């Protein structure tokens, strides 16, 4: 347990229909910020602040750029640690989220159409204007930092402890399902599994939505790619790139990748919300979708699940949606066919070897 994040429950979840396995949900939606990001971002901020305060020469101040959940996690951690915090969000960020961040006491600046533009503004127009003689900045990337991954890995410590307390062998765990955006959560899960010698024994199923499936595309191509635009409704998963560490881990370990459609995710979110009285956003619904659709999960794992097999789903949380948002999104999708973005038209390579890769 930490001052910046909560120990969350690992609970058995019964999904409708005939059970093909035992599902356990890790309820990261119960974090201070409503999402798993409180673990990693809180860890980064706390470690950095302790180091700066121990040095005693300057005062720590946090600077974050985010489309929502990461910025809110940073602001929430700073509220608990009594640290000043500035968050730059893009114009696409909902007013509800802007207000939530601001209500923690953080300064919120709205700039740029997308996260990358907000991040550039933060670095060039905010951070470079601070008095570096007095302030030592703590820059918070949404996902690409080892301290963030270290913080996320703590959920595996809790999972192992909870299984042990329930007298359940980790050998029964046939997979961990998580949503993948930039890869911060995924990296943390891998590092946690490595700590217990389980990384090469328990496969991870990474779930994305079509239109922000950078992880899936990178694995298919065989190298990290960058998307030109994000078209999925799961904006919390909407990053143009994954971290290099994510790609390396996925190549090293037995990771599976699943891509599902926005409409399916929204339907899952509403289904879960109505059944369990808990609002979830599409980024979280992507992982939960496999609990409702075990055939997809079994295809990803490459084997049938037995009744006593265990699958853990990370309910990663998020605070960007209301029930009304989900219902309006689904209604809009039903009125018109959502276009499928062709992968070949939506990514660029970091290197000029496309022809060689395609012919390989």
From Swiss-Prot:
InterPro entries: Ser/Thr_Dehydratase (IPR050147), Ser/Thr_deHydtase_PyrdxlP-BS (IPR000634), TrpB-like_PALP (IPR001926), TrpB-like_PALP_sf (IPR036052). The modification N-acetylserine is found at residue 2. GO terms for cellular component: mitochondrial nucleoid; mitochondrion. Gene3D superfamilies: 3.40.50.1100. Pfam families: PALP. One of its GO terms (biological process) is L-serine catabolic process. The modification N6-(pyridoxal phosphate)lysine is found at residue 37. It is found in: Mitochondrion. The keyword Acetylation applies. Belongs to the serine/threonine dehydratase family. This is Catabolic L-serine/threonine dehydratase. The gene is CHA1.
